[in-house]
Regions:
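Post-Walker A alpha-helix
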Residues: 54-55
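Charged, amphipathic alpha-helical linker segments immediately N-terminal to NTP-binding catalytic cores
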Residues: 1-23, 199
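Conserved lysine of the Walker
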Residues: 51
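Pre-Walker A adenine-sensing motif
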Residues: 20-36
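Short hydrophobic/aromatic-rich motifs at helix boundaries and adjacent loops
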Residues: 2-3, 26-27, 139-143
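Walker A (P-loop) phosphate-binding loop of P-loop NTPases
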Residues: 48
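Glycine-rich, often acidic-flanked micro-motifs
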Residues: 32, 36-45, 60-204
Length: 204
């Protein structure tokens, strides 16, 4: 019952909240996010790229998790804030084992406890996970930024040009204020600590 309640809460705080925000012209991204002191970092990537696993790893390291798979962003003067939306965090079995968490053998994904925070955090940097033969962090510039982030927008209206213009306008404002980096790493959990170190060098 607890897992079912957690799934419902995750849906409410994630997809349902994102839908209502999108209808109001607000921005949510398919992403995970973690608070780093008084700032925050956001992570995007294809399904299975490790966004949730990395957020859970950072949570285990003591950094509060703001979002698991949907991050809600609000503009505040010259910055963007990540609103907390983490109600339940779910991981695949192999990720649980790698993080030393006992997996729920009766379910495809296991609900895990992570450190959370109740207030919004200023977004310092965004990172896009890609496969590479070593851990590398490079700044993304130009139209490639839109190419990376546009598919990550939580959209629920697809056939209205005005809605698309609003989405692109929000993305443009976001990218003008918050840097986007590509973070390459080999597949596997043994590189999580190095990825954390390189990320912290950018954010802190």
């Amino acid at each position: 019952a607890d897992a079912d309640a957690g799934s419902v809460d995750k849906l409410k705080q994630g997809a349902v909240r994102a839908m209502l925000r999108h209808l109001r012209g607000e921005l949510s991204l398919h992403a995970s996010a973690v608070a780093i002191g008084k700032r925050s970092a956001l992570f995007v990537g294809a399904s299975g790229s490790g966004k949730s696993t990395f957020a859970a790893y950072l949570g285990e390291r003591g950094w509060p998790v703001l979002a698991d798979d949907v991050a809600h962003l609000d503009q505040s003067e010259d910055a963007f804030l990540v609103q907390p939306s983490e109600g339940a965090h779910f991981l695949m079995h192999d990720a649980c084992v790698a993080l030393g968490i006992a997996p729920d053998e009766e379910r495809v994904k296991t609900r895990v406890a992570v450190k959370t925070v109740g207030e919004a955090s200023k977004l310092a940097a965004m990172f896009s996970f890609v496969d590479d033969d070593a851990v590398r962090v490079t700044r993304v510039a130009g139209y490639e930024m839109i190419q990376i982030l546009s598919p990550c927008v939580a959209r629920f209206v697809f056939d209205e040009p005005a809605a698309l213009r609003t989405d692109l306008g929000r993305l443009g404002t976001l990218l003008a204020k918050v840097p986007l980096y590509r973070i390459g790493r080999p597949r596997g959990f043994e590189h999580l600590a190095e990825v954390e170190q390189r990320m912290l060098e950018v954010v802190q």
